Amino acid sequence: KIQIIENGPRGVAFKVTQRDGKSTFNNIIALSSGGQCVEIYSETEWQSLCTLAKEQFCFNANNDTATFDLALGAIKRKNMSEKLYEVPAQNWVDLTDKSGKYGISVISECKYGWDKFDNSTLRMTVLHTPKYNYRIDSMQSMMDLGLNRYSYAIFSHEGEVGADTQL
């Protein structure tokens, strides 16, 4: 279900509601008038056991390498492989087109697991309920169940990734 919730001089926003099994995903996607990025506010009632959920971003930028923020620096990583299927990033991940003329950054203050599926796709892990408890007292099989709120933004830029391309 898609519903327009704001369309005026301040900007535009719409709400997308989706269900998967017993879980409900509500995303508000907003662009402020004159804004530099698209902001996404997510509220998920997570009731899926033994499941991992990811937000997937498919872009026109094409490169087998992306840049992942590590808080004290950044690292370039290639597309995922059988042995490297998820990597950490602190605040942002950037996919700059191999031409170097433009790129896209996904900025998140609270989600840290990522993968680069192919030359134009980034995926951010947002929820996870493992199948097993790996420690008897950990309750990992209940992790992330219930209401979860998180936000992220998509920011486009000219040129290579750098200090001036991050918000």
Regions inferred by a protein language model and the residue ranges of each:
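C-terminal (or distal) subdomains of carbohydrate-active enzymes
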Residues: K1-L167
